[in-house]
Amino acid sequence: MRLKDVTKRFSSGKFYKGKYKKFECHINYSSYSDSWYYHISSNDKRDIRYNSLWDELKFKTQEDCIEGCQKYIDGVLKNAKISKKMG
């Protein structure tokens, strides 16, 4: 996933934006907690949104955060395919 730096001027953290399998991904660094977290949105009729902080998931490195984001999206898509087959 390619990330674009969208950090605002004078911000104490870092903010990046990217896309993965039609999901909009935001990878953020919090200087207060010295950790990375992500939030995603599907921007389509599925209206899927998720923030890793809801489950208290924080990452030590940006790479780990990106990997966690991609794994979450892959899991959502896999579950959607299974439910389509059953329904």
Residues covered by each model-derived region:
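Short N-terminal "domain-start" leader segments
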Residues: 1-40
